[in-house]
Design a protein with these regions (language model features):
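Long, amphipathic alpha-helical stalk/connector segments used for oligomerization, subunit docking
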Residues: 221-293
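Post-HExxH zinc-binding segment in Zn-dependent metallohydrolases
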Residues: 199-242, 300, 304, 338-341
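Catalytic Zn2+-binding segment of zinc metalloproteases
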Residues: 185-197, 215
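Active-site His/Glu-centered metal-binding helix of metallohydrolases
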Residues: 180, 184-188, 208, 299
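Contiguous, non-catalytic segments that form substrate-binding/exosite surfaces or channel walls
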Residues: 44-165, 352-366
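C-terminal, non-catalytic "cap/extension" segments appended to globular domains
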Residues: 66-79, 94, 263-370
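Short pre-active-site segment immediately N-terminal to the catalytic Zn-binding motif
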Residues: 161-181
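N-terminal helix-rich structural modules
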Residues: 1-81
């Protein structure tokens, strides 16, 4: 069955939802799903409706094949030690996609949530420093932050006009700092994906949150709290985990004998327990996660980032420093795509290079105590 959708009607519906958000500064799951739906059909003239799998975007498998090709090419050009490390990581993570406490993350996120709770405790103490680290965001007109007494938090970003809103309010489970950091991650992911959208992609946001951290860590390190480095380490590991899990999925796809809808569906179910009913939604969001990394060189940047985080987690300081030096160049190129030159930025160099020496001491201490 083929449904003919009116683009004018779709745009009208989407505009009405966006006006509702702007007026009420709030949206729920229904609005999120509606906006997601309208965006998914906006650029398709013919939408094929199937009972099991409605609204599959055209070109999805083609995009997966392209990513698979670039992944293999980038992998073949990696240094041997990084290639071995990466293969070990993706194989180890093959069955742990839905388990945040599985190896190698059980030391990072213990089952009693001590690290996470400590992170929030530190975050509460530095809430007053929000304006400091957001100054850079303001000056580059990436996002406008508005503190509202509301029951939820979300990010709206108008990519083409380079403006948007982040709404957040602290509650018993979180803090202004942690919410805003998360929502700003959404704003960066939305900008890099080039969409004029009003909904969030969690996988993308968690992945890019690592780059937001270079603006926030300075103020964490300035505090005298005994556990002042833990929130930084937690965020590094969360971003690393999301990145390497994405690579693990891509690695499985790249090793399929024949990349087609059925083979990818079967692989996702067997390895990651993705139900057939969620196949379209999961796969489209996975594609979006890698939208920026559509060249062999850029996939190489992601390898470098994962290598540096793996070395840091293992306490391999020599390898960590080597990988980090490559990652600095990667992050600066990432920000250049946003029109921000941070390669010569004092703030960037101070936080990402000098302050990581303090972070290394904490990691060494943690590994010694094991």
């Amino acid at each position: 069955m083929i449904l003919k959708w009116s683009k004018d009607e779709t745009l009208k519906n989407l505009e009405s939802l966006q006006k509702y958000i702007d007026k009420n500064r709030y949206y729920d799951e229904n609005i999120l799903n509606s906006i997601d739906f309208y965006n998914s059909i906006l650029n398709d003239d013919d939408i094929f409706l199937e009972e099991e799998e409605p609204f599959i975007k055209k070109g999805l498998i083609k995009k997966l094949k392209n990513l698979s090709f670039l992944y293999k090419k980038a992998l073949n050009n990696m240094p041997s030690y990084e290639k071995k490390m990466l293969i070990n990581m993706v194989e180890e993570l093959g069955s742990s996609f839905i388990n945040p406490y599985a190896k190698p993350f059980k030391e990072v996120m213990p089952s009693d949530n001590t690290l996470y709770e400590t992170s929030l405790e530190v975050a509460e103490k530095i809430d007053k420093d929000l304006v400091k680290y957001l100054d850079y965001i303001y000056k580059n007109k990436l996002v406008n932050v508005d503190r509202q007494n509301i029951e939820t938090s979300y990010c709206n970003i108008d990519v083409y006009n380079k403006k948007g809103y982040v709404y957040a309010s602290p509650n018993n489970q979180s803090s202004m700092f942690s919410i805003l950091n998360h929502e700003l991650g959404h704003s960066v992911s939305n900008i890099t994906n080039g969409y004029n959208i009003y909904y969030n992609l969690p996988s993308v946001a968690e992945f890019y949150s690592i780059y937001m951290q270079i603006f926030t860590d300075k103020y964490l390190y300035d505090k005298t709290h005994d556990n002042k480095y833990l929130i930084s380490y937690y965020n590094y590991m969360m971003a690393y985990r999301q990145s390497i899990l994405g690579l693990a999925v891509l690695n499985h796809i790249a090793n399929l004998d024949n990349i087609n809808k059925d083979s990818v569906r079967e692989m996702l179910y067997e390895n990651y327990k993705v139900e057939p009913s969620n196949f379209r939604n999961y796969l489209e969001r996975f594609i979006l996660m890698f939208d920026y990394y559509t060249t062999e060189e850029n996939i190489g940047y992601l390898f470098s980032f994962c290598s540096s985080m793996k070395a840091l987690n293992d306490g391999d300081n020599k390898l960590y420093k080597k990988a980090l030096s490559e990652d600095i160049d990667s992050v600066s190129k990432f920000y250049n795509t946003l029109g921000i030159d941070i390669k010569n930025s004092e703030l960037f160099l101070e936080i990402f290079c000098k302050e990581n020496e303090k972070l290394e001491k904490l990691i060494r201490k943690r590994n010694t105590a094991k």
